[in-house]
Amino acid sequence: MSNQSDKSRPAADQLMAKYGSEAFQHAPSMTRSRLEERLAQGDALDQHFIKTFVDFAAGMERRRVLDKRTRWLVQIGQFTATRSSGHLEDTLRAAIAGGVPVREALESILLCQIYAGDTAVAPAVDVFTRVARDLGVLAELRKDQLPLDGHDRERSLEAERKSWKPDEENHPAREALMQKYGWLGVSTGIKYRGAHHLNLLAHREALDSEWAGLWLKFTYQNMYSRWVLDDKTRVICTVGDTFAVGDFVQAHDHIIEALHLGIAPREIMEVVFLIGPYFGSPKMAASLKVLEGILGKQGRVAEIGNPPPVK
């Protein structure tokens, strides 16, 4: 928060006149009051810089490649994964005020347990709890919690098996893995990663079978089977998280998953572009290179404009 006193800070109408209405119409992942604080702080320190940043960030907010809900949920996850508590608070307040369901905002934070761990999620939960209490929405989270066993009791192996492809059904390791670890995590993995999941689980089982079981249950039976967010939103948030932390190996796999789920290349590219204002050009450029490489292999570069190679 800015340390400027209210008396010394320019009025909102003065800030709007100086920096333009665009920033106020498309506040960059923050509430209007917080934008006024940021502008006033920047106005006192370096007016050219704050205008340069706000014009860039507000310009990204103005774009409509992603709907507001998706963009906010992606950014909530990114600011969680990168331990950016100030930006996380700003975005949570803007998102909840803008109509994002509180449960979905929390879920974007909790999913970061997979790729950023508890050292990122625990402080983010503290921020979320404070914001939710301030906004009077904390109590409603008691009403729609999952039971302790999640969706396990509702699931049917017979029903899920019908969606398996021949290479998944006939995979030489599948039956033994299901016998050893149960079918729930294996089936969720098949749903999202296909035969690759079975290959990965077989590899990890050979490394350490006990650890592989713990990993499978945590990641696939539990976290990826929560289904608080729809699959497309969850996966595009995961792509955003991996971009933000610079995990381009996992980003590669989840981009392929996103494309398989029907997420458009331009939607994924928009997540790449959003990296720029908040996490810098190096991560944005690396993320774009990964995406273009995948689209090239799939013969889909035309869907992002057939850009000429950079020499």
Describe the function of each predicted region.
Residues 57-61, 75, 92-96, 109-110, ...:
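Amphipathic alpha-helical segments within well-ordered protein domains
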Residues 48-54, 81-89, 213-216, 245-251:
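Short acidic alpha-helix initiation/capping motifs at coil-to-helix transition points
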Residues 116-119, 276, 281-285:
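Substrate/cofactor-recognition hotspot
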Residues 86-98, 103, 122-129, 248-267, ...:
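Extended intrinsically disordered, low-complexity coil regions enriched in Ser, Thr, Gly, Ala
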Residues 53, 70, 88, 105, ...:
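N-terminal alpha-helical segment
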Residues 61, 65, 82-86, 100, ...:
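Residues in soluble alpha-helical coiled-coils and helical-bundle/repeat scaffolds
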Residues 1-68, 121-231, 260, 284-311:
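Acidic, glycine/proline-rich low-complexity segments that act as flexible tails and inter-domain linkers
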